Amino acid sequence: MSDESSTRRKPPWSKCLVRKWFNIKSKGQLFQDVDDSISKGGDGEWRSSSFSERETWRVKKTRRGDLMPEIFVSTWNVGGICPPLRLNLDDWLLSSPFADIYVLGFQEIVPLNAGNVLGAENNAPAKKWVSLIRKTLNSPREQAATGAMTPVYLLVARKQMVGIFLTVWVRTEMKDDVRNLRVSCVGRGLMGRLGNKGSISISMSLHETSFCFVCCHLTSGQREGDELRRNSDVMEILRRSRFPPVDDLAGEGRLPETILDHSRIIWLGDLNYRVALSHNAARSLAQARDWSSLLENDQLHKEQRFRRVFEGWKEGKISFPPTYKYSANSDRFSGDDLKVREKRRTPAWCDRILWYGSGLSQLSYLRGDSKLSDHRPVFGVFSAEVELVCCGSPTKSMACSGSRIEVEELLP
């Protein structure tokens, strides 16, 4: 007698292709995307046992307290370049004191050609990036000020949609405090559905506080009116992003189902908003480091002032050069050298990090100097207020069979 798995019929290749084209996924697949990333990503052994195979411990709440973990958030459009194995990421990831959580988002992790957009997903570059990040974060070193050894970081979530790639890393000692990991993808590319543009959102709970990290790649273009298409992308991402509805085992009721339902929200990515000036005018202001004059013509700032997009969202002060577009392996803006045939693009801050809601305080907002692609990475460090159960007596309950959400661990 054949087992159940062997009797299941795989959907025809045409149906699989249509599902990819239109980013159609069932509820089970949405869970599976996260679970595969966690349990098979090399760091997920602590979550590999099924929820129905073990008992759950709940905390009887008697008092609350607050934590203030630091979160390092970064976005980088790598231009479809597969990272060399010896690529040094120290200047990017080790530019700040150790954070508790690292949220690292990429765009164009693969070239956005027809094969990658319409065909099978190419995850080879993603594996290389994960390996390099793990090696960098966990390299032996000491903090000069305290002499403390490096904390060890685990990859708790990762998700790829064509060229967009989002990863979340946490300190080892925090792994049991991260629960309810879920993912939502929205395609905004060809036909408004394909994944060459769009977003990946990861939802999670840290103790009693919900977090949502949104990594996006919005519509490109520097023609007048293109900013309105980017506004539309943002509105569609907010409208269409939905996380699988499940009950929170901590007893807090239903988990957030939309991006804006979360307590702490950070949006990162290549937003592609440009500077509404000529190439020469923008280049002259950039060379003079006159950021304020450039930012007066920044499309994102203008659209926010007119309340057409990201109303109520915050962004840190920009005090660094534009992040796009640079010539290969150079600090020269693309198109400056008339002897070289290359696309001429007005210098702009395409790569941004924003946040929404209370409980988040940005400690720094900087630009990296890697010349790997035509974009420069942008990163910020946040201090986040997190509610937790300080003390209480544990009560034991049996887990529901088949549930995919994480266990409520016994807190100290």
Model regions: which residues?
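N-terminal, active-site-proximal structural segment of metallo-dependent hydrolase catalytic domains
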Residues: 1-154, 164, 226-227, 234, ...
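Structured beta-strand-rich core segments of catalytic domains in phosphoester-bond hydrolases
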Residues: 51, 116-218
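Short, surface-exposed loop/turn motifs at beta-strand boundaries within globular domains
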Residues: 64-71, 97-99, 160-162, 195-197, ...
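Residue-level detector of short, conserved catalytic/binding motifs and their immediate flanks
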Residues: 71-74, 102, 167, 200, ...
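Extended hydrophobic secondary-structure segments that form protein cores and membrane-embedded regions
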Residues: 73-74, 103-105, 154-160, 167, ...
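Active-site metal-binding loops of divalent metal-dependent hydrolases
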Residues: 78, 107-109, 172, 218, ...
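Residue-level signal for secondary-structure boundary sites
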Residues: 81, 112, 175-177, 210, ...
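Catalytic lobes of large eukaryotic enzymes
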Residues: 124, 128, 132, 136, ...
